[in-house]
Regions:
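Juxtamembrane boundary at the C-terminal end of a transmembrane helix
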Residues: 584-593
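Cytoplasmic/organellar membrane-interface segments at the starts of transmembrane helices
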Residues: 244-245, 376-381, 433-531, 546-581
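Hydrophobic transmembrane alpha-helices and their helix-loop junctions in integral membrane proteins
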Residues: 95-105, 113, 119-138, 148-454, ...
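Transmembrane helix-loop-helix hairpins at membrane boundaries of multipass inner-membrane proteins
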Residues: 1-7, 17-117, 193, 197-201, ...
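Hydrophobic alpha-helical transmembrane segments
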Residues: 75-90, 209-224, 418-423, 517-540, ...
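Hydrophobic alpha-helical transmembrane segments of polytopic
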Residues: 5-12, 31-45, 82-89, 115-122, ...
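Short phosphate-coordinating micro-motif centered on Lys-Gly-acidic
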Residues: 143
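Hydrophobic core of alpha-helical transmembrane segments in multi-pass integral membrane proteins
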Residues: 13-18, 39-50, 90-95, 295-296, ...
Length: 593
């Protein structure tokens, strides 16, 4: 079975190559159908391998197996978390391709295979990163998915905003990749190894961590946290989501950002969790401090957005912070909770972006103010947006609710309050949009670009062009079926008995500590906190709609909004600041050693 692991990468790459070569001669329906078939086949393969992933599968590509414990071959590891992420990537890619069939206009120059080919390469890069067993090839897959993501973000190259957003994305993430590569070089200089497990063993044999190990940890983590859009590396994400096509946003927020979090978990657990790596107390401090800052920043910025796609992007940032806090507990419960949380969040967030895309193609805007009351006819879409918002809030029985429940119980203390408030605020922002856009509730907002100093830093969603090339008179069934199925999947992740426990055990079985039997189930406290965050979200949204001036105080968030300047130089400066902060937070590991 392990010999099938390379196919998770080879199949989508081959499909992309064939579409790129023959796309000019294929009808769009055939090209899109072929891409969907490749993604569906890859998803089936990932699920098949996942069912046989205990014990973990290993494959040395090309037969380059270790000799005397050393190898220069490419190691692929098929354990529960890696194959689970690969399956999630394939399923979400299939959803994005199916959605794009009617949401995007005709391909440029008559090349029907161009967009689906890029999406398949993106899928291959993400799957390769998920199953990479050595650090250098993880970097290679990291770069492949990054480069393709830049191209997909700037797909509408005729628009200056798309190019600018893609450029900011590319520059910041490329610098993060350089940091990752330098960290790999330092670790290789110390250990002479590239396989993740071998690096960890070599560091443990060397003794307590020193400045070189600290530098390697900080640089590797910087690259991964840039991809995860953690504070203060997050500035590229809202700019990219504002201009990227909706199917691309579904993948960026649904799974690519989560792969950055997955990389943080994988690298720390396999490489740095031993006596030669970073002590547990220092790792906990790094992850929880950054996680808390990310959650608060994302929630505050999410609340003050009127551009719906930017609002959803900041929501992703906020929930990334919650993921990092749970990882920072360094417990099997925290890891299992995050894994289930990621699955539920992927379905909910991709569905919400799909609904935002429907608004853009139907009304030519994603501005909450401009769309006030205009989407009353879209009752089905309204129901899905409300359901997605409640999923973000953690309403049982969504998978997000069960995962969040386990994670917040593992974190405990003040972090429980942060989980409730962050999920409530991000959900309330989406509910506010639903009430105004689909029901026309509340006073009519003032014209976009109004007065006030804060408006200079406010990004509206007006003036957008429909991605379908023209405003849709009727929303195609595929564009509504995709978010409906995604929400159903997110609901099933929490409602299907035993699914959460299976996810948690798959994660714990892949850790260096070995299998820890954890049971993920609903508890009275978890259900109560989920209901509390949902009720709080509804209350906040109701006040925001009925009394806009009471909670809408943009001046309080003005310092944060000014930081989102759109200037690449500012974003690079913050990347350097973030790297320094990581070093300061981890420094006690060296001083105590």
């Amino acid at each position: 079975m392990h010999h099938l692991l390379p196919l998770l990468v080879a199949v989508p790459l081959l499909g992309a190559a064939l579409l790129a070569a023959t796309g000019r001669h294929l009808p769009r329906t055939v090209a899109d159908g072929a891409a969907c078939a490749v993604s569906a086949g890859s998803a089936a393969l990932a699920l098949l391998l996942l069912a046989h992933s205990s014990p973990p599968l290993t494959e040395w590509a090309g037969g380059w197996e270790p000799v005397a414990g050393h190898s220069v071959g490419i190691l692929l590891t098929g354990d529960g978390p890696g194959l689970g992420m690969a399956a999630l990537v394939c399923v979400l890619t299939l959803a994005a391709l199916a959605y794009s069939r009617r949401s995007l206009d005709e391909p440029p120059h008559g090349h029907a295979g161009a967009f689906p080919a890029l999406v398949l390469v993106f899928q291959a890069g993400m799957c390769g990163f998920a199953i990479a067993g050595d650090l250098f090839n993880a970097f290679v897959w990291f770069e492949l998915m990054s480069v393709v993501a830049y191209a997909l973000t700037g797909h509408r190259v005729e628009e200056a905003r798309a190019v600018q957003g893609a450029l900011a994305f590319a520059v910041v993430n490329s610098l993060g990749a350089y940091a990752l590569l330098m960290g790999i070089a330092l670790l290789y200089a110390r250990t002479g190894e590239l396989a993740l497990a071998r690096i960890g063993d070599a560091l443990d044999a060397h003794g307590p961590p020193d400045a070189l190990v600290l530098a390697g940890f900080v640089l590797v983590l910087t690259g991964l946290l840039v991809k995860a859009a953690a504070v203060p590396f997050q500035f590229w994400l809202p700019d990219a989501h504002a201009v990227a096509p909706t199917p691309v946003c579904m993948l960026l927020s649904g799974v690519m950002v989560e792969l950055g979090v997955f990389g943080v978990w994988r690298v720390y657990d396999t490489v740095f969790s031993g006596p030669g790596g970073l002590p547990a107390a220092d790792a906990e401090r790094v992850l929880t401090v950054l996680g808390a800052a990310t959650a608060v920043t994302g929630a505050v910025m999410c609340w003050h957005q009127r551009h719906i796609k930017r609002l959803l992007a900041y929501s992703t940032i906020a929930h990334t912070g919650l993921f990092l806090i749970a990882l920072g507990t360094l417990t099997p419960e925290g890891d299992g909770g995050v894994a289930l949380y990621v699955v539920g969040h992927a379905g909910v967030k991709a569905a919400l972006f799909a609904c935002a895309g429907i608004l853009l193609d139907r009304y030519g805007s994603v501005d909450e103010h401009v769309l006030h009351g205009r989407a009353r006819p879209l009752r089905g879409v309204a129901v899905m947006v409300v359901a997605g918002a409640l999923g973000l809030a953690g309403l049982p029985p969504f998978g997000t609710a069960l995962g969040k429940s386990v994670a917040e119980e593992a974190a405990g203390g003040p972090f429980t309050v942060l989980y409730v408030l962050t999920s409530a605020v991000t959900a309330a922002a989406v509910l506010r949009v639903a009430a105004r856009v689909f029901l026309g509730l509340g006073p009519t907002p003032r014209e976009a670009g109004g007065e006030g100093a804060e408006d200079a830093y406010e990004t509206t969603g007006s003036g957008e062009e429909p991605e379908s090339g023209r405003r849709l008179g009727r929303v195609p069934d595929t564009m509504t079926a995709v978010p409906a199925l995604l929400l159903a999947g997110a609901l099933a992740a929490g409602a299907v008995p035993g699914f959460g426990t299976a996810v948690a055990r798959a994660v714990s079985g892949a850790t260096t500590a070995g299998l820890v039997h954890t049971s993920v189930h609903w508890t009275p406290l978890g259900v109560g906190l989920g209901l509390l965050s949902s009720l709080l979200a509804v209350a906040l949204a109701a006040v925001a709609v009925a009394r806009p001036g009471r909670l809408a105080v943009p001046g309080r968030a003005l310092p944060l909004r000014r930081l989102q300047s759109g200037h690449i130089g500012d974003y690079v400066a913050w990347l350097l600041v973030g790297t320094t902060v990581l070093g300061v937070l981890a420094l006690p590991a060296v001083l105590s050693g």
